[in-house]
A protein has these predicted regions:
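Conserved beta-strand scaffold positions in the cores of enzyme catalytic domains, especially
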Residues: 35-37, 109, 127
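Short, flexible, glycine/charge-rich loop motifs used to bind or transfer phosphoryl groups or to couple energy/partner
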Residues: 26, 115-116
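Short, active-site-adjacent cap segments at secondary-structure transitions
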Residues: 3-6, 81-84, 117-120, 134
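Glycine-rich phosphate/diphosphate-binding loop of Rossmann-like nucleotide-binding domains
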Residues: 44-115, 124
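Predominant activation on well-ordered alpha-helical scaffold segments within soluble catalytic domains
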Residues: 7-10, 25, 52-59, 63, ...
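Glycine-rich phosphate/nucleotide-binding loop
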Residues: 9-33, 122-126, 130-172
Length: 172
């Protein structure tokens, strides 16, 4: 239960002073590194300030986990053009842009990130609301499971495939 987990964590760890509501963070593998997403289900609806805070929280997490000095932060949207997105994402982008321009900022804001760009290595942290983030999480899990089953079926199809699988096993 996400809500119970979040409540328990807040009780033990407390909240950062400037954070309204914490988000659930997940790190996804990419071909060359990882991408950190926040929020993945704690806040189904949120305000622009919360969405911007998810970007900052994700940057802190990414810095601690991966040692990146200035993580590249983006907001998940339906396109990369500034005119895309919703009122929520456009307002959050404005807040993150201002925060990244501050002299003490420790992240770079890159703007919108499309779903197709989550795993291409151009972004380190993706901020999203919990509703959308949870859909991304469940979709990624489903795709990973489907691809695993398809590869497994192809590798066990016949004798030649099984030999190929045996040769490929150390790399997998």
């Amino acid at each position: 239960n996400s809500g119970a987990m979040l409540s328990h964590c807040l009780f033990i760890l407390k909240r950062l002073p400037a954070v309204e509501r914490p988000g659930i963070v997940q790190v996804f593998p990419t071909p060359n590194a990882t991408v950190t997403m926040c929020d993945l289900g704690a806040n189904v609806s949120c305000k622009p300030t919360m969405l911007a805070q998810f970007g900052v929280l994700g940057a802190h997490y990414d810095r601690a986990l991966n040692g990146r000095s200035r993580p590249r932060v983006g907001v998940l949207s339906n396109g990369t053009e500034p005119s895309k997105g919703t009122k929520l994402t456009r307002a959050a982008c404005e807040l993150l842009e201002k925060a990244a321009a501050h002299p003490e900022a420790d992240f770079d804001f890159i703007g919108y990130v499309e779903g197709s760009g989550l795993f291409d290595g151009h972004v380190d942290v993706v901020a999203t609301d919990g509703f959308t983030g949870n859909i991304v999480l469940k979709t990624a899990e489903g795709v990973a499971e489907a691809v695993t089953q398809m590869v497994k079926a192809a590798m066990l199809k016949d004798t030649r495939s099984k030999l190929g699988a045996l040769l490929a096993k150390p790399a997998l």
